[in-house]
Amino acid sequence: MISKCIFPATVVSLFSVCWGAPSAPVLETPHMIPRPAALRAQTGESGFSLKNGVRLPEENPLSRQAERIFRDNGINTVLVKNKADIIFTEDASLGREGYRLAVTPDSISIASGSVNGALYALQSLVQSVAADRNGDPALPRLDVEDRPRFSWRGLMMDSCRHMMPVRDIKKILDLMERYKFNTLHWHLTDDQGWRLPIAKYPRLTTVGGARAQSPVIGNRNKGDGIPYSGHYTADEIREVVRYAKDRGITVIPEVEMPGHASAAIAAYPELGNTDIPGYAPKVQETWGVHPYTFAPTEKTFRFLEDVIDEVCALFPDSPYIHIGGDEAPKDQWKQSPAAQQAMRDNGLANEHELQSYFIRRVEKIINSRGKRLIGWDEIQEGGLSPTATMMVWRSWMPNSARHALEQGNDVVMTPNSHLYFDYDQGSRKPAAPEYETINNNHLTWQHVYGLEPVPQGTPREREKQVLGCQANIWTEYIPNLPKWEYQVFPRALALAEVAWTPQELKNEKDFRKRLDRQLPFLDARGVNYKRPDNGAPAQPEAVISRERH
């Protein structure tokens, strides 16, 4: 039984210490997700015994990471000066994320081009743990040479509609590490709340971080009458960034502009189009798109420069600043004499060009701080900067990716048709209102697995501009971690394989077998995934409700 592979650390530590003995024959084939680029396993023979744990080389800094990963998977470790069981070597030819792994009855060898490659090798290792013929934990004889197909393998977390405490974000990061995701895109500002601490502008969180109420869960047309507020502290953000980095994950911050700006404008009304009739900004209490956009003024650009400076300090390792750029209504700019004057002053033909002007001004600020701009595919409207990276989300606009690639821009594929994990997962789901989704589009794990990120017809020389793919998890109807897990798993495992495994090795039937073998791990971690067989939540006792902040 695969459940034997999940060994509590307390049990493993009770075994008598007798290192280095080969295991009894291992009969189980590894069931890794994502599937490696090249894997050879010898089953039915003695493997490497984990009965007494693993000896790690004391002098190698990678041993600290190995110690953590083994411990988290119930495998005892000890640091030794010599006679270590694992040998770490560096091989630059494997690239930043590639690795080579070999397991014999006597030793484990890991070669990698970087720390990240070694982390992936260790995750492949713990996913290969099986019970030998005696029921003891062991590794089969293995030879793996592996590297990812795409460099961007991401999940997006929306903390604006509903925010999760840091402890829950850490659980998400742990699961991302296991399945070799390397990017957490953190959506921190929107119409319904500003969650990002900016010391120079405290009202962004004290005012912009609080809405008077939210739609009732299960009835989107009715307000619940309960205030919802909260934000992350600078220390909490640094803690998340550090925790993610230790797991090979880069956190990309998003600050929405010029639209989805209601919360910021409610906090500092002078940032909006104050010269329009009926100007009355507030933090929005309903979902959807709202009309408040930043005014294209020097005051706004100074504000955004200050915000970007603090964001760069909070996220020093992120090569990008995500500026949103999506769903920016032009109505207020059309009504605003000041916005119209800005168009005339800068020779802009329409409001779409005004948005491009706005984004280019912001991009100069971002670039001057050593970062790159990334935004949703609407940043293409009115003209796309040649150095911007574009996230393609509108599947009904199939030419947007092609046009960006033709211009030489990098793209990340996040099509709502395949990768909006807030969408319904299929016809089988709990009837309880708390399992309501934003729409009834049936987006199954099979649908996710069928995604080909490189747009059809992309010339071979342009394929490298497709950095990868990412699932977006908007949280209008996801108030806490149990609901987030139900929406994301097992679809995230399908995406992990899409983003990592060579296209020619993908096989849905084989993936389903390996998926079933991963479920005991998710059960052991208390993940409230959607059961593939009947759609029920894996943790039926989980409470789906808003946590107050």
Go through each PLM region and give its residues.
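Bacterial N-terminal signal peptides
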Residues: 8-17
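Feature activates predominantly on carbohydrate-active enzymes
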Residues: 94-320, 361, 365, 470-475
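Acidic, contiguous N-terminal accessory segments
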Residues: 20-151, 367-376, 380, 517-525, ...
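Active-site neighborhood of glycoside hydrolase catalytic domains
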Residues: 266-270, 282-388, 394-403
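Flexible loop/turn segments at secondary-structure boundaries
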Residues: 163-165, 191-197, 258-264, 328-333, ...
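Flexible, acidic glycine-rich loops studded with aromatic residues
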Residues: 372-388, 394-549
